[in-house]
């Protein structure tokens, strides 16, 4: 029997609103920190299917979320495309060779690096209650390309943004390679047991309006189209963080089934500009749940009220902060669970 989250993504509006949180499996949980300390590095944890299964299940056991999102990372795709991937303490991810300097042809694809992720999905699906929806995910091509070009994360994505103007053909080739492998990757996740997938475009907001169509809308549309050609029942949540006024163009142009709002979007405005009946996910500010208190509860109720007339999945506007107290999450869960349309 499909769960509440899956029903909502299929455009059913229920009395109760389903709930999950971006980065719900992670460092704010003491059980995660304990497992991470035993296992060592982040990447080792991701590629250890038994450990990754356990991390994925930890927030489900503790909070009873309606969705379990695969514990992995968006940079698994460039790793499978042949870049060396390291997570350095205090520095974040590093990819080499950086494609600002090297050519894409210098990379040798290693698709078998994805096999451990598929095994994690299989193990999680086998362990989950049937009514808990299993979510897979991948990074969207623009966001993944920003890391591949720069070799690391950056505040302004300057390397990739500059390449979009100075060598758009090279950037297009990188994006096309990401699209190809991402479609394969998402098909593999669905075949292993994922019931819906989310495309994270964390740096969509860094592009000028005339660049947004080419590097955000078109690549995501290609993934959605090809994924649905391969798996017609696939459900896709799009998350164009920072899209702002371009949100409606993204919704219309990509073909995603549902759209996730970041915390800067007024949900009442989103309700007026998005297609009727389209499920919306979001969008409490991660810093508001970090702060907690009555203000968090009131804002949560305001978001629920603003989206009461369409299918709504409650979530944050981005990933939960690692310092968020468990008690604040528990209070959020209680607030959403006790709210009715």
UniProtKB/Swiss-Prot annotation:
PROSITE patterns attached to this UniProt entry: UROD_1, UROD_2
UniProt subcellular location: Cytoplasm
Record-linked Pfam families: URO-D (PF01208)
InterPro entries according to UniProt: UROD/MetE-like_sf (IPR038071), Uroporphyrinogen_deCO2ase_HemE (IPR006361), Uroporphyrinogen_deCOase (IPR000257)
UniProt keyword Nucleus present: no
Catalytic activity as recorded in UniProt: uroporphyrinogen III + 4 H(+) = coproporphyrinogen III + 4 CO2
GO annotation, biological process: protoporphyrinogen IX biosynthetic process from glutamate
Keyword ATP-binding: no
Marked site (Transition state stabilizer) residue numbers: 73
Enzyme class per UniProt: lyase
Pathway the protein takes part in: Porphyrin-containing compound metabolism; protoporphyrin-IX biosynthesis; coproporphyrinogen-III from 5-aminolevulinate: step 4/4
EC number of this enzyme: 4.1.1.37
Residues annotated for substrate binding in this entry: 23-27, 73, 147, 202, 318
A GO MF label: uroporphyrinogen decarboxylase activity
Any one GO cellular component localisation term in the record: cytosol
Record key words, sorted: Cytoplasm, Decarboxylase, Lyase, Porphyrin biosynthesis
Protein family per UniProt: Belongs to the uroporphyrinogen decarboxylase family.
Database matches in NCBIfam families: hemE
Subunit (UniProt): Homodimer.
Biological role: Catalyzes the decarboxylation of four acetate groups of uroporphyrinogen-III to yield coproporphyrinogen-III.
Name this protein carries in UniProt: Uroporphyrinogen decarboxylase
Organism: Erythrobacter litoralis (strain HTCC2594)
């Amino acid at each position: 029997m499909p769960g509440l989250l899956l029903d909502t993504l299929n455009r059913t509006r229920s009395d109760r609103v389903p709930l999950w949180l971006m980065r719900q499996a992670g460092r704010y949980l003491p059980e995660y920190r304990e497992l991470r300390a035993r296992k060592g590095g982040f990447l080792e944890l991701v590629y250890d299917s038994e450990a990754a299964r356990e991390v994925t299940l930890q927030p489900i056991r503790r909070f009873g979320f309606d969705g379990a999102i695969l514990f992995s990372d968006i940079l698994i795709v460039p790793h499978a495309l042949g870049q060396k991937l390291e997570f350095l303490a205090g520095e974040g991810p590093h990819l080499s060779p950086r494609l600002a300097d090297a050519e894409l042809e210098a990379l040798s694809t290693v698709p078998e690096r994805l096999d451990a992720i598929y095994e994690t999905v299989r193990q999680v699906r086998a362990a989950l209650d049937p009514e808990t929806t299993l979510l897979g995910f991948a990074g969207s091509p623009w966001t993944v390309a920003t890391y591949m070009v720069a070799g690391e994360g950056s505040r302004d994505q300057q390397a990739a943004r500059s390449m979009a103007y100075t060598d758009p053909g090279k950037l297009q080739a990188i994006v096309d390679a990401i699209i190809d492998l991402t479609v394969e990757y998402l098909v593999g996740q669905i075949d292993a047991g994922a019931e819906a997938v989310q495309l994270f475009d964390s740096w969509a907001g860094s592009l000028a309006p005339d660049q947004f169509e080419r590097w955000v809308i078109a690549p995501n549309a290609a993934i959605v189209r090809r994924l649905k050609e391969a798996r017609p029942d696939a459900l896709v949540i799009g998350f164009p963080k920072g899209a702002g006024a371009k949100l409606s163009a993204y919704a219309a142009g990509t073909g995603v089934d549902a759209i996730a709002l970041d915390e800067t979007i007024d949900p009442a405005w989103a309700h007026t500009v998005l297609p009727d009946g389209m499920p919306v996910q979001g969008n409490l500010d991660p810093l508001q749940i970090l702060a907690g208190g009555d203000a968090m509860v009131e804002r949560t109720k305001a978001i629920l009220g603003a989206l009461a007339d369409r299918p709504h999945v409650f979530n944050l506007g981005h990933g939960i902060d690692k310092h968020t107290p468990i008690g604040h999450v528990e209070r959020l869960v209680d607030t959403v669970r006790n709210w009715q349309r």
